[in-house]
From Swiss-Prot:
A lipid is attached at residue 429 (GPI-anchor amidated serine). Expressed in flowers and siliques. InterPro entries: COB_C, COBRA_pln. Residues 1-24 form the signal peptide. This is COBRA-like protein 6. GO terms for biological process: cellulose microfibril organization. It comes from Arabidopsis thaliana (Mouse-ear cress). It comes from the Eukaryota.
């Protein structure tokens, strides 16, 4: 992996030298827009189709959605999987999920039973919790919610079964559909490709069966596709700096008549709530106009440690953020000693060669829900870090994070020029202390030798 990183660095230098700065930045922006995340380089959602049984005109399929992302999850209202049938196939039966519409099934009126769905492009949704046992399958019925691998590995997979039939005039063999979409803003999917058949364990692992055929489609996330504007911002402060560095002005937009002013009641009753659609944020009026603000405060300086307080505040009057998470990039996170009131996991996507990224999330039933804007619409933690004497300093804004993400979306940071700085007296006092210390050592050395001569 070290060799790969070195090769990547060399390629970057070469590209910088042969391309103009503008063209190079356009290329980097395209990589980001296409869904590459350097903090989670292997993150993706995989749609897997397993053909379990097949007979002329009828095919039994298991479809699985697996969230392979470390910290980005699919929250309510959940995924809505759709695709395009190539030969007007129909879905006769489903378990673990259902289509949102049946469509026109008049071609099968004489068959006695109508198919579950006859649409050329069906939209499938997960069943809700509490669905009848006779329609459940393993890993179903969570309302389309997919947790991230780091935060809740047990619930990062959804699955359903269906029986696919041919149209009256269509071919009898099974054909994979195309043009997949999971119905979550920011995600784009490629077409399915054939992979090695999935193997299933039975009889407590003593026997393995396998699918007749397996295909996979990959979906990746891009924040640029998800939203035209950012969703969070960062403010900074420190014990040695008298002012708070606020979020940059208009980080997520500029003030308008759509925000909620102090003393006003949020327009809950005026909002049209579709349970199958995410509610648009209505934020409290502020200079930054972001639904979420993250505040990083350098709180205490000890001899061998230092302490930071992190606060996430919800300015969105329309939404509680369930199972929220934060991802922070800072070089001293490799020396985290203790995290109070949050869960914490170090993220090392490059095989432990770099350990400067950490993920924070709430404790279940305590602070795993960030409530809507109000007096209790915040969560906070403190973390204790051991000083790395090789590079630790409070100078030049080193104590502040390089990047912060909330629920997988990049937050707008203040400019490094605006970071809290040590007062000039601290620089001069440290220099004076060094001089005084040196003079004291020399004085003690001379005094010792004078006493020996006496």
């Amino acid at each position: 992996m070290g060799a790969m990183l070195n090769l990547l660095l060399v390629v970057t230098v070469i590209l910088c030298s042969i391309l103009s700065p503008t063209r190079f930045m356009i290329m980097i922006d395209k990589m980001v827009a296409d869904g590459y995340d350097p903090l989670d380089p292997f993150g993706k959602i995989i749609i897997k189709w397993d053909l379990l049984l097949s007979s002329p005109g009828q095919h039994h399929v298991q479809v699985t959605l697996e969230n392979m992302q470390e910290y980005r999850h699919v929250e309510k209202p959940g995924w809505k999987l759709s695709w395009h049938w190539l030969n007007q196939e129909v879905i006769w039966d489903m378990k673990g999920a259902e289509t949102t519409e049946q469509g026109n099934c008049s071609a099968f009126a004489s068959s006695g039973n109508l198919p579950h769905c006859c649409l050329e492009r069906p939209t499938i949704v997960d069943l809700l919790p509490g669905a009848s046992l006779n329609v459940q399958v393993a890993n179903c019925c969570r309302g389309g919610v997919l947790t991230s691998m780091s935060q809740d590995h047990a619930n990062h997979v959804s699955a359903f079964h269906m029986t696919v039939g041919s149209s009256p005039d269509g071919p009898e063999e099974f054909n994979m559909p195309s043009n997949f979409d999971i119905g979550v803003p920011g995600y784009s999917c490629d077409n399915a490709t054939s992979v090695s058949p999935t193997k299933f364990s039975t009889d407590k692992g003593r026997r393995k069966t396998q699918a007749l055929a397996t295909w996979e489609a990959v979906c990746v996330y891009s924040q640029f596709r998800s939203s035209p504007s950012p969703k969070c911002c960062v403010s900074l402060s420190a014990f040695y700096y008298q002012n708070i560095v606020p979020c940059p002005t208009c980080s997520c937009g500029c003030s308008s008549s759509h925000c909620v002013k102090d003393g006003e009641l949020p327009p809950y009753l005026e909002q049209k709530h579709d349970p199958d659609e995410e509610v648009s944020p209505v934020v409290k009026c502020s200079d930054h106009m972001c639904p979420i603000r993250i505040h990083w405060h350098v709180k205490v300086n000890y001899r061998e440690y230092w302490r930071v307080k992190i606060t996430a505040t919800n300015f969105n009057t329309m939404k509680n953020y369930t199972n929220w998470n934060l991802v922070v990039l800072h070089p001293n996170l490799k020396s985290v000693q203790q995290v109070f009131s949050f869960n914490y996991k170090s993220l090392t996507p490059y095989q432990n060669s770099i350990n400067d990224t950490g993920m924070f999330w709430g404790v279940q039933f305590y602070n795993d829900v960030l409530l809507q804007e109000g007096k209790i619409g915040n969560v906070q933690t403190e973390l204790l870090l051991k000083k790395d004497m090789g590079n630790f300093t409070f100078r030049e804004g080193w104590a502040f994070p390089r990047r912060i993400l909330f629920n997988g979306d990049e937050c707008v940071m203040p400019s490094p020029d605006d970071f809290p700085r040590l007062p000039k007296s601290a620089h001069s006092s440290s220099s004076s202390s060094a001089v005084i210390s040196s003079v004291s050592v020399v004085f003690c050395f001379l005094l010792h030798h004078l006493l020996l001569l006496v």
